[in-house]
Structure formats: C-alpha cells, structure tokens
Amino acid sequence: MSVLVISCNSEWDEEQYEQYISFKAPVGDKGVTDIYVRYKQGGEATYRLPMIVSGSLPNGKDRTVHIAVDTDTLDILNAARFGREDLYYVALESNRYAFPSTVDIPAGTFSTLLDITFNLDNIDLFKKWVLPLSIADDPSYNYEGHPRKNYAKALLRVLPFNDYSGTYSTTAMQVYIKNRDGSIDKSEAIPTTTRTAYVVDENTVFFYAGAMDEDLIDRDKYKIKFHFEPDGEKLVKITSDNDKIKLNQLKETSYTIAEVPDVTRPYLLHRYVTFSVDYEF
C-alpha cells in the first residue's frame, strides 16, 4: 500500500516582504532627485511626493508616518561627492517650503502623497538648493522606514521652471576669444553642445556667459539674464548685475516658440524656444 501526502501552502496569503515605508524619489547620477516646480512670482506652487508601503499584500492597518528634515544626510553626500565647498548642495531655506509633519496611509492602500508647498520668489539658482527629507522612526510608531538608505530618504533638488528655462541645444553656438588688438580668430571657436537656462522670474532666465563652465569657482560673476518680452515683437534683452564683465548686446534679438505634441504620448507637449543673440563681455 502506498500513501501520497501533499501539503499545499497558499503563498500569497502570507506576506512575502516586510511592509516598510519609503519615498518614491529615484536618485539620479548626481546623488539627488531632481524635482521641477513651476515658478510663480508672488505665489506658491505645490509638489506632490509619492510615499509607498512595500509588500505583497495590501497594507493591513492605518499608519501615520512622520516626516522630518534631514540635513545630516545632505552633509554626508556633500563630503563624499565634492572636493570644493562652493559645489556643495545647499539645504533649502526653511521659509521657502512647508509640509505636514505627518501623513496618513489608510489600511488597504499602498501609497499616499506628501504635499510640499514652495515659495520660490527671487531665489538665486546659482546655489544648488536641496530639500532633504527623511521618514522618522520611533518604537512607538506603527510603521518602519525602509532600511535601504535611499528609500527612506529623499534629497529633492528643487528646480523651478518657467516657459523659457531648461536645456538648450547650442551646437550652432560659436564662442570666440578676442585678441588684444580687438581682432577675432574665427578658426578658434570654443565648441558647446548644450547650455542650461535657470529661472530668474516668470519671463527671465540666466545663462552662464559664453562657454563658462557651470563648475567654475567664480561662475556667479558671469550670470547673464535673458528677459523674454511676452508680448509685441517678442524681443530678448540681456543684462548682467556685474558691470565688471562689460556685457554688450551687439544686435536686437527676437525669439520664436513652437509647441509640438508628442507622437506617442499625446498628453505631452514639446516646447521649443529658439533665438539667436550676439553679445560680448
């Protein structure tokens, strides 16, 4: 006589993973998470940061998650990544943001959103502003933050944007060094492929002049503001707060805007700002 005994365990009735709490804030190659916030002169803008409960089963209980600012982690990142303090990420000033100290994740749900309100009036993007957040742990809390270091922390690089900021293709840009006698050798052009425009206000951005490197120690001296007049002839006017660079716009410049829907994702709109400007400094 033979007996066959079979044991069956419904593996999906038991939790396969710990139900840890984490931010959904993927870290980029620069050690932080870039977030883009619409610049509003005199107003506030809200960014919604996802928070999730890990696990293979639905969240089984109501959880109240505590959020804290974590400048220690930012200090560690700066020390490990940069050899110069002028390149450090800077903790965003406390008067420029607000968020609730706790967030509720109801039973039966896997995620929620942390609403962060920003006030970015007159912010100087010469500095690399970061809002460092952490999920606070305590034995009295009814949750655990994720033990992996990048999951329970969010280093949010705050990047305001307007209709003219972003990365520009500059493959056609030509930068020359003027000789002492005022002549220019056009065979010695300095090549550049892209330049980044940073927000100043709703209709103004700044670039670093010419081919100046964005990691230059005294790069702040070479900020050139480009003001895009939204009406009329759509002119571009350039200025600098530093008279010592002797900025001179050589000709009047206008700009055009083209908006093209994405071919495969119709909810996306590609916006192309085009202009040509001649200046010397």
Residue positions per predicted region:
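Intrinsically disordered, low-complexity regulatory regions in eukaryotic proteins
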Residues: C8-D104, L113, T117-L131, A136-F281
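Sec-dependent bacterial lipoprotein signal peptides
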Residues: M1-N9
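Multi-pass membrane catalytic core of lipid/isoprenoid biosynthesis enzymes
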Residues: V3, I105-A107
